[in-house]
Amino acid sequence: MQSQNIRIRLKAFDYRVLDASTQEIVNTAKRTGAQVRGPIPLPNKIEKFTVLRGPHVDKKSRDQFEIRTHKRLLDIVDPTPQTVDALMKLDLAAGVDVEIKLQS
């Protein structure tokens, strides 16, 4: 019988909230007896926006804004049914996008 893995990708704009959520998932998985690989930091995505400061002339005067998206990857190896139940009941912080994939 093949072992199953749970792959969890987390995304957030604030890395502190992301790291706290990642640690919460790791603690929950280890408490239920599963083996955890990670967290693996993935490359950050930086979106930059340049806008004119004034509504009229003076094109040389501009503001730049950026949005940084931080990402983490977790692999849970051989999860038990208790692990899956605990992860489903887990309530993470607002602003963290969670993507879960089940792999064989």
UniProtKB/Swiss-Prot annotation:
Keyword Ribonucleoprotein assigned: yes
Pfam families, per database record: Ribosomal_S10 (PF00338)
GO biological process: translation
SUPFAM superfamilies per record: Ribosomal protein S10 (SSF54999)
Cross-referenced Gene3D superfamilies: Ribosomal protein S10 domain
A molecular-function term among this protein's GO annotations: structural constituent of ribosome
Keywords for this protein: Ribonucleoprotein, Ribosomal protein
GO CC annotations on file: ribonucleoprotein complex; ribosome
InterPro entries xrefs: Ribosomal_uS10, Ribosomal_uS10_dom, Ribosomal_uS10_dom_sf
Keyword Ribosomal protein assigned: yes
Quaternary assembly: Part of the 30S ribosomal subunit.
Family: Belongs to the universal ribosomal protein uS10 family.
Function of the protein: Involved in the binding of tRNA to the ribosomes.
Record-given protein name: Small ribosomal subunit protein uS10
Organism: Ruegeria sp. (strain TM1040) (Silicibacter sp.)
